[in-house]
Amino acid sequence: LARCWRPTGRRVVLGLPLVVASASGPAALRRGADGEFDSHFQAVARILADGGLGDAILRPGWEFNVAGYAWSALREPRAFAAFWRRTALAMRAAAPGARFVFDWNPNLGDGPVAEAYPGDDVVDVIGLDAYNQSWPFHRDPERRWRHLLDHRNGLRWHRDFAAARGKPRSFPEWGTGT
């Protein structure tokens, strides 16, 4: 990765699966929060830093409020937050000279998003993945835009949540369509 990316002069943004191997679900989140996977994330941190990617923007457990991901926080948001926190601390400790940027990144969707927040001291950026898609229930563009703005975890929520913590915002994944 470093050999391919470093010559571009651009900063790399990586989504990091928050569970490893065959681990998934609430039990895996608790195991991660207890440190079982620390060595995995420490190795990733060293590889990135040693490869000249110590300024990477990292998105551990992206879109954690989506049910389909093995690291979904829907059932245990506090275990997710503890695991995410531990991952960020382990990676920073493993590569102390790196300047990783940790982007906490829900999806515009449902779920206990705020309850899965790991803390201001480990989150550098508050991201939101948002897609302007015309699902059958949002064919009208104005209604669709209101949904994006006013959804429980929508654009207004994102703005207010980040501002309350003094954090910059990002949109790591976004798109528009019909």
What are these regions (language model features)?
Residues F102-P112, A116-S134:
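Acidic/histidine-rich catalytic cores of soluble enzymes
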Residues P17-V19, G61-E63, D103-N107, Y131-Q133, ...:
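Active-site beta-loop-alpha junctions enriched in small/polar residues
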Residues A21-S24, N65-A70, G109-G111, S134-P136, ...:
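Short catalytic/ligand-binding loop motif for oxyanion handling, primarily in non-cytosolic enzymes
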Residues P77, A116, R144-L148:
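Short, surface-exposed loop/turn motifs that are enriched in glycine and acidic residues
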Residues R3-C4, D121-G177:
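Glycoside hydrolase catalytic-domain groove-lining segments
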Residues E76-R92, A98-N105, D124, G154, ...:
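Extracytoplasmic, non-cytosolic globular domains
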